[in-house]
Amino acid sequence: MSQFRIESINPILNVSDMPRSLHFYIDILGFKNSDWGDDNFTCIVRDKSCIYLCKGGQGQAGTWIWVGFDGNIFELYEDLRLKDVTIRQAPRNYSWALEMDIEDPDGHVLRLGTDPDYSQPFWTGS
């Protein structure tokens, strides 16, 4: 295999309504919109990560994205719940992460996770 270095991997999400998606990602999740973006294609950025949004193209609704973060998942859960974000799964402690799932306006799922809580039992599905 040829040698190469991956600099970044950033998802491109198909959105049906750019203003609605920008409201969700910017006003609710705290991303910032790129200066060069327009009504059909843009890049939203938070910390050192970005997600591309493409109106009516490049992808399917229902894409899942892992978002690893450093913070209190229970505080984030309460904040998003109070903002009427669709919560698909409340925080659960797994062996790989303490995580929860939320849904954006186009049905894409953001799987938000942080380090597992080793002082608590792991979720086993029962």
Predicted segments — roles?
Residues 1-22, 63-65, 116-126:
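N-terminal beta-strand motif that seeds the catalytic metal site of vicinal oxygen chelate
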Residues 19-32:
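Amphipathic alpha-helical segments
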Residues 20, 37-42, 95, 118-120:
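Short glycine/proline-centered loop/turn elements that form peptide/ligand docking sites
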Residues 30-35, 86-90:
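Short secondary-structure junctions
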Residues 32-64, 109-115:
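Conserved short beta-strand elements that form part of the metal-binding/catalytic scaffold
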